[in-house]
Amino acid sequence: APKKKQVVAFLCDVDDRMAAPRRKAFPQAGFYHDWREMFDKESKNFDAVSVAIPDHNHAIVGLSAMRLRKHLYLQKPLTHDIYEARILTQAAEKYKVVTQMGDQGASCDGMRIMREWFEAGLIVDITEVYKGPTRPGWPQGIPWPKQHAPVQKELNWDLWLGTAEKTDYIDNLVPFNWRGWWRFGTGALGDMACHIIGPAFKLLNLGYPTEITGSATT
């Protein structure tokens, strides 16, 4: 049977600067700033939701989509913390929708080639895997700056905060450096671990960890 045509029916973004190129690429799509309004008004007019927003709002948007019986593609990291991940896992089982976490690192040609080598017996007897990151490329592990900055007129700061505690804006937080603040992001580990560590788990079918150790400097 022929595949059904995929249509981008609606776009949603709290930042008009970031939304502009997407709106230009999909001029036929409806546009909203508030995902809640879009879900309330348009839920009968779309089948699936793709979520690519700051980590702290992943769970609430993903859970709300599944409660509407919408299939869900949720960018990594799946959620801000483990509790939220468990809630989404339970919801996916309850509502019987198709779900996938976006992880380009596990979908690249390198992953496919490694799988071919492994299945051909070219890589055997693996007992240890070492992984190293190239991040962070942003400030992290420092106090929240006391020097606040004006919010750009194109950004709806209240909607961007979402589930996070209300706070003043700081310079250069959006669109990328929010990853370095726990109230919004998950640091270099949350941003890159799925790309760097994930392929080993997928290739070797490792399952859940049985023990984790860590250290940090101050």
Where are these regions (language model features)?
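N-terminal glycine-/serine-/threonine-rich beta1-alpha1-beta2 phosphate-ribose binding loop
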Residues: A1-L74, H80-V98
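Glycine-rich beta-alpha junction loops
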Residues: D15, G132-W138, A164, A216-T218
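A structural signal for well-ordered alpha-helical segments within the folded catalytic domains
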Residues: A59, L63, R86, C108-R112, ...
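Rossmann-like dinucleotide-binding domain that binds NAD(P)(H)
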Residues: W157-T218
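Residues embedded in well-ordered beta-strands within globular domains across many folds
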Residues: F10-C12, S50, T127-Y130, L161, ...
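A contiguous active-site-proximal alpha/beta segment in oxidoreductase catalytic domains
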Residues: H71-Y73, T79-L159
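Short, solvent-exposed loop/turn elements at domain surfaces
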Residues: A19-P21, W138-Q140, D168-I170
